[in-house]
Every structure is written in C-alpha cells, then in structure tokens.
C-alpha cells in the first residue's frame, strides 16, 4: 500500500544526516502534529453534540454512546497497533491510520441516521485514531531515545492538550456559525494533510538512516519486540495474558481506567454541554477547554521532567488527588468566570500529566521490549473508562436533567485512584522477558 519504509526517503536522510542524533526531535515534532490532530478529531464530538441534536433531533445519550464507541475502539486498537508497528512497520501503520481517519471523517458528511454516526465517528474513526495515540508516543520514545524519555513522553502527551488548544476554539466557532458539517470538513482536511508529512520525514527507526538513538553510544542496540518476528496478534494477546497475571498491571490498568473516566470521557465529552446547561455558550465553553489545554501543556511537560527525577507513584498520587478535588469542586463553583478559571487551572495542570509516570512504571515493570505493548493495554483501560464515562454522563443527564452527580462520582473515583497509585511496586520485573530472536 505504501512504499518501503527505507526507500527513497530514508536514503536521502541518511545521505545528508540532518541534525545528527537530534533528528530524533524532528521525528518527535511530526509525531506531535499527528497526535495533536488525532486529539482534535477525538474532541470534535463534544463540539458537535448540540449541533447534531439540533440538526437531526437525536437524543444526547445516543450521540454520547456513539462518541463512547469511538473512545472505546480508540483504546482497544492501541495494543494491537503497538504490535503491528513492530510487525509491518511504524510508517505503514501510521499512514494507514491517517487514511482511515481522514476517510471516515469525510464520509460522515453524508450521514442522516444515528447508525451512520456510529459507523463513521464510532467504529472507523475510533480504530483509525487508535494507532495515533499514546502507544505511538511510547513506541517513538523507546525507538528514538536512550535518555530524556520522560521529558519527551511528556511533550508528546501534551499534544492532546495542544489539540484542544488549537482545534476547539476553531471548530466551536465553525459549529456555532455553520453547524456540524464545517467541523467535519476541517478535521478531514487537517488529517489528510499529515499523510505526505509523515511519508517524507519519519523514517522507520534510527538505523534506517544510519543513526542510533538520541543519547546512545555508537554500539547501541535497541530492544526488538518478538512481534517483529512472529504473529503480532498472538504476541499482543500473549503479552496481555502474562501481564494480567501480575498485580502491578491491574493497579496501572485501574488507575488509567479512572484517568480516562475523569478526562476525555466525562470532561472532554460533556463539559461544553454542561456549560450550555448553565447558560454558557459553546465558544466560551470551548475557550475554557482551551485554557485547560494551555495549563495541561505546561503541566504534562513538567510532569515528564519530574518523572525523570522523582518517584512516579507519588506523582500519580498527587495528580489524581488534585483532579478529584477539582471535579468535586466544579458542580458547586457557581460557574462564575472566576470559579471556572480556578477549575481550568487546577484541572488543566494534570489533565494528561499521568501519562509519563504511568509509562515509566510500565517500562520498569515489563521492560523496554514488552513495555509499549503492555502500556497499550493499560491505555485500553483508559479508553474503556473514557467510553464508560461518555455513555454514563449522557445517561445521567437524561435521567436527572443535569451533570452534577456524574462529576461528583468522577471526583471520588479520582481520589480512589490516588490511593491505589501508592500501592504500585516495580522494584523487580513483573515477569521475565521472552527470549529475543537471534
């Protein structure tokens, strides 16, 4: 479907050696853009919820359920995408995902019934964006960096915040002036524009251009996953089976389930609608999310720096604790300008700040070879939590007429996750790595 990953682009890069080892940061920049656009795609249903409701008369719980399907498949695709990147190549996997994302989004312009929404924005965009997620960042970090991994993962995790920062005000303005169709068009074009950028600038791995990982010596040999030599599907499931027999996996899975439940599942999907119930317009509510995005960009980058230096378990405890208190505060805030700014700052600082310490704990427990795939399954837990919250929030709104109880429950689960984080122990490997093929 796509040209071999080392011809001709990697040959040209190898001949010119642009930036030396620092070319790793060029790759990070391109992947950051991919993650940013994927975050914009995943945040679009929050802006489209009211326009779709007004345009088609669809109930909010139905629209929320479609968004939840997309979030769920986004997460479940991740671990298979991580193994597929090892089996057929990162470039091919990423390019195919961008094609699916752009195509399914554009196809939704023709939708007239709820099942069309489920197919385009639920199934296909969920699967397509699943490979352009945290597992992609984890794979890039392990392939391209020997040092500064926490900082780089923090930067790439912050792309979710930047996606909100860049896309939400734009698509909210488009939705307010023209309905849901301009939003769909903008997302489809932005996704399609990344395809040639990835093809031109992202080699398969440092060795493809005659380099080693950033911060590594010339004789560095990066770890290779067994998925690159065998059945990637079997390896992905076998890694899950082995990881599921360990306590540390379930602690990480549970806390990341709560992370998804309390971020893109509830706040990302329902905050704009919650603000609408309180008399705040879509553009103003999107501006609030953008402000949160600014502080998350700061908080997640700082979290990556802190993860390289401090106990990640304690960091997670602090992050989840602050998040829980913020969510409990919001329903009682009065939704004044000052109170919403306070919420945006406190909540925004740790929106995605949990990713760098969670990845470090996964790599410490399961190793560099299995770590990204295990992390993919942990991210699946995140998205199961997010999908649950997306559907739960819409159902609570239909049953009670407001979102207050949904946000209070989410806050309490975050505080529980803070306590669980302190129980995680990665002082010894969770299981022995599989033998590496010769």
Describe the predicted segments one by one.
Residues 76-115, 307, 313:
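Conserved MFS/SLC helix-loop-helix module at the cytosolic interface between two early adjacent transmembrane helices
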Residues 284, 290-296, 302, 307-361:
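C-terminal transmembrane helical hairpin of 12-TM major facilitator-type secondary transporters
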């Amino acid at each position: 479907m796509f040209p071999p990953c080392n011809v001709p682009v990697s040959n040209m890069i190898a001949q010119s050696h642009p930036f030396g080892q620092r070319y790793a940061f060029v790759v990070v920049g391109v992947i950051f853009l991919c993650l940013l656009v994927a975050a914009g795609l995943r945040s679009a249903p929050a802006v489209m919820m009211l326009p779709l409701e007004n345009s088609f008369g669809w109930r909010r719980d139905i629209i929320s359920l479609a968004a939840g399907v997309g979030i769920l498949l986004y997460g479940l695709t991740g671990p298979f995408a991580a193994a597929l990147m090892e089996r057929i190549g990162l470039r091919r996997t990423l390019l195919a995902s961008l094609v699916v994302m752009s195509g399914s989004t554009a196809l939704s312009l023709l939708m007239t019934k709820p099942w069309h929404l489920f197919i385009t924005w639920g199934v296909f965009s969920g699967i397509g964006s699943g490979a352009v997620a945290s597992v992609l960042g984890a794979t890039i970090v392990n392939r391209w960096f020997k040092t500064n991994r926490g900082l780089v993962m923090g930067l790439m995790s912050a792309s979710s915040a930047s996606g909100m920062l860049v896309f939400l005000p734009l698509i909210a303005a488009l939705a307010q002036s023209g309905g849901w169709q301009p939003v769909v068009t903008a997302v489809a074009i932005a996704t399609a524009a990344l395809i040639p950028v990835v093809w031109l600038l992202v080699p398969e791995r440092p060795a493809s251009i005659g380099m080693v990982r950033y911060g590594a010596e010339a004789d560095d040999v990066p770890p290779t996953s067994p998925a690159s030599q065998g059945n990637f599907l079997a390896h992905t499931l076998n890694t899950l089976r082995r990881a599921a027999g360990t306590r540390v996996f379930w602690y990480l899975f549970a806390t990341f389930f709560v992370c998804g439940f309390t971020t893109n599942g509830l706040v990302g999907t329902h905050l704009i609608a919650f603000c609408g119930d309180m008399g705040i317009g879509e553009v103003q509510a999107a501006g609030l999310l953008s402000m949160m995005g600014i502080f998350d960009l700061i908080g997640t980058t700082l979290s990556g720096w802190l993860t390289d230096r401090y106990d990640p378990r304690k960091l997670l405890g602090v992050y989840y604790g602050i998040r829980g208190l913020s969510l409990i505060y919001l329903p009682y805030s009065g939704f004044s300008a000052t109170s919403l700014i306070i919420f945006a700052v406190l909540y925004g600082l740790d929106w995605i700040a949990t990713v760098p310490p969670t990845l470090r704990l996964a790599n410490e427990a399961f190793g560099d070879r299995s770590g990204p795939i295990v992390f993919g399954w942990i991210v699946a837990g995140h998205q199961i939590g997010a999908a649950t919250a997306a559907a739960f929030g819409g159902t609570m709104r239909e049953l009670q007429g407001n979102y207050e109880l949904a946000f209070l429950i989410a806050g309490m689960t975050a505080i529980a996750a803070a306590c669980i984080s302190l129980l995680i122990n990665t002082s010894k490997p969770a299981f022995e790595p599989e033998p590496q093929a010769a």
